Design a protein with these regions (language model features):
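Acidic, metal-coordinating catalytic segment for phosphate/diphosphate chemistry
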Residues: 7, 124, 186
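DNA-contacting surface of Y-family translesion DNA polymerases
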Residues: 179-271
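Short beta-strand-to-loop capping motifs
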Residues: 99-103
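Short Gly/Ser/Thr- and Asp/Glu-enriched loop/turn motifs at secondary-structure junctions
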Residues: 92-96, 135-138, 271
């Protein structure tokens, strides 16, 4: 569900549909952007930008507080909707879900049509748009939704490496490791295809990327064996807080983490 927060706010207030909108952690000058519309991006804004800088750069952008209750309710509705198509659903983030459709061939003749049905049902009920990526694994399906604008797009088994080849390495999870980023930048590697070629020389690849070599090589080829894990409410406790202002004060952060830990402990004891 791309930019779900922005979509939700525009449903609540249709006047926002053509305006530059940014969701912020707080109105304090030290708050930051959590989500923003395409119009806000055109104003030069980006995620993580401080509110103080936003106010200097753009006077047209509407700044809205993070409405956790609203977003959680939408997320729960979408979870229930996709769960009616398969019993194995894994919520990954607030606006992202993995569905395991293995063994569903006897029920659904065409998985792409199932994807369109899911998107249509969500759109009809709550007016939220989304995209679906279909592939043999979670990694490729997730990348599909990030780079392909189609409502539903499928990568056939065996075509994962070809699909990934022209893409920026930033889409591979292992590339988020700082040391890997530095190596790729030094080697001027700007496409996953370059990683695929280097990975063919296994010894040299291992020397370059060390303990991350095997994982990076698998990801570059579109291999992922991680399973979709069904959501279990009883085994999942979530406590979170949006700070009124960003801070690196260790004492404040420690106190918040301690408070969240105590809340979780209390819930566990009640079980």
């Amino acid at each position: 569900l791309h930019n779900m927060e922005i979509q939700a706010e525009r449903i609540i207030d249709p006047r926002l549909k053509t305006q530059a909108v940014a969701i912020i952690s707080s109105n304090h000058s030290n708050g930051s952007i959590i989500s923003l519309s395409s119009e806000a991006k055109e104003e030069g804004l980006c995620r993580g930008m401080k509110v103080s800088l936003v106010r200097k750069m753009s006077h047209r952008t509407q700044l809205l507080p993070y409405n956790q209750l609203l977003y959680d309710r939408i997320n729960q509705y979408v979870y229930k909707t996709v769960s009616s198509f398969t019993p194995v659903v894994e919520p990954y983030m607030l606006n992202e879900f993995f569905l395991d459709m293995a063994g569903m061939d006897s029920i659904y003749d065409n998985i792409k049509n199932v994807g369109f049905s899911i998107i249509k049902r969500i759109k009809d009920q709550i007016s939220i748009d989304g995209t679906i990526g279909i592939s043999n694994n979670k990694l490729v399906s997730q990348i599909v939704t990030a780079v392909i604008p189609d409502v539903v797009h499928k990568i056939n088994r065996g075509h994962e490496s070809q699909f990934l080849a022209p893409l920026n390495p930033k889409f591979l999870p292992t590339v988020r490791v700082k040391s890997i980023q530095r190596i790729l930048k030094f080697l001027l590697i700007k496409q996953i295809s370059h990683i695929q070629v280097i990975a063919e020389q296994s010894e040299e690849f291992k020397i370059l990327f060390g303990i991350h070599a095997k994982t990076l090589s698998r990801e570059a080829k579109g291999h992922d064996t991680s399973k979709v894990k069904s959501y279990r409410y009883r085994n999942h406790i979530l406590e979170q807080r949006i700070l009124p202002e960003d801070t690196n004060d260790k004492m404040i952060l420690y106190a918040i983490v301690k408070d969240l830990s105590e809340r979780i402990s209390f819930k566990l004891r009640k079980r």
